[in-house]
Amino acid sequence: MTMKEAIATVVEGRDLAPAQAAAVMNMMMDGQATPAQIGGFLTALRAKGETPEEIAAFARVMREHTVHVKPRVSGTLVDTCGTGGDGAQTFNISTAAAFVAAGAGITVVKHGNRSVSSRCGSADVLTALGVDISVDPGRQAGIVQETGIIFLFAPSHHPAMKHVMATRQDLGCRTVFNLLGPLANPAGAAAQVLGVYDQKLTGPMAEVLSLLGVSRAMVVFGSGLDEITVTGETSVTELANSRITNYIVTPEQFGFTRAAPGDLLGGDPEKNARIIRAILDGAPGPARDIVLMNAGAAIYVGGRAATLAEGIRHAAESIDSGKAAGKLAALVTATRGAS
C-alpha cells in the first residue's frame, strides 16, 4: 500500500488492515513519506478514528525501529508512562510514583520525554532532581539491574521519529502519535499503568495493550487527569492476562480525603522537583495521596500486591521507610556515573 492509497482509504472512512497500517508506519519511520503525505494521513486518520488494530500495528512498527534496552532482572518490568495532554498542569505524578513503586520492589522502566503541553515533562523534572537523562542506552540495562529503576528518554530510543516530528509540530493537534509513546517502551515493559487524556480511550487502549502482548495493565482516566486521581472518580479499564474489566475507583475507597484540583498544581521543573522531594521525604497531603494511589497501581500490576488497596499500603511503606527516596538517590548516582 502506498501513502496515497492509504490516505484515500482513510479519507473514505475505511479502516486499515493491520498489514496496511504497518506498511504506512514503515514508510513514515523510514523517511519515505513526504511531510504533506504524513500530515494528510494523520489528519484523515484522526477524523476517521483509529481502531485498536491500527494503533497496535503502528506500535509494533515503532517498536521495531526502537533502540532497545534489555535488562536481566527477575520479576516484571513496569512502566508508568501516560499519554499526557490532559492540560491540568499538575506536578509530575507518575514520575514520583515510579520512585515509590521502585522502593516497594518493582522494577520500573519509565518511558518519557520533555514537556509538550505542560510546563514540565518527566524528563524536565528528573533533570531538576539531578538525574542525567542522557545516559547512553547501552549503559541503561546495567543501571536497571543495579538500582531497579531507569528513565528511558524517548528521543534517545526513537531516532526514526525525526521523520515525523516537524509535521506533528506543524499540525498542532493530537494525532495517533500521542497514543504511541506509552506503547513503545524500549525495555518492553510487560505491565503498565497508562493514563489517557480522554475517558473514551480507556477501553480501546486496553485492547491495544492486549494485542501487543502486555500481560497486566490499568488504563486510567481520573476526572480530567491522565492519572488515578484523588479529586474525584477514576475510570479504570484493567487488563489481566487477556481479560478486560471496567470499574470506577474513588479516593474514599482507600481512606483518602477528596482533594481540589488546585491541591495538585505544579509549575516549572524546579518547583515540581521540590514537590516530589517533599513527597519522598514523607510530607502528608493530597500530593502524597495521589502518588500513593498511582504507585499502588504500579505495584499491583507488577505482581507485588493482590489488590490495589494492598499496593497502596506497600507504597506508603516505601515512602515511610525511606526506600522511595533511596531509589531517587541511587538513580542520580548511577546515571551521573554512567554518562
Curated annotation (Swiss-Prot):
Anthranilate 2 binds at R168. One of its GO terms (biological process) is L-tryptophan biosynthetic process. InterPro entries: Anthranilate_Pribosyl_Tfrase, Glycosyl_Trfase_fam3, Glycosyl_Trfase_fam3_N_dom, Glycosyl_Trfase_fam3_N_dom_sf, Nuc_phospho_transferase. SUPFAM superfamilies: Nucleoside phosphorylase/phosphoribosyltransferase catalytic domain, Nucleoside phosphorylase/phosphoribosyltransferase N-terminal domain. 5-phospho-alpha-D-ribose 1-diphosphate binds at residues 82, 85-86, 90, 92-95, 110-118, 122. GO terms for cellular component: cytosol. It comes from the Archaea. Its cofactor is Mg(2+). Mg(2+) 2 binds at D226, E227. Catalyzes the transfer of the phosphoribosyl group of 5-phosphorylribose-1-pyrophosphate (PRPP) to anthranilate to yield N-(5'-phosphoribosyl)-anthranilate (PRA). Belongs to the anthranilate phosphoribosyltransferase family. This is Anthranilate phosphoribosyltransferase. It comes from Methanoregula boonei (strain DSM 21154 / JCM 14090 / 6A8).
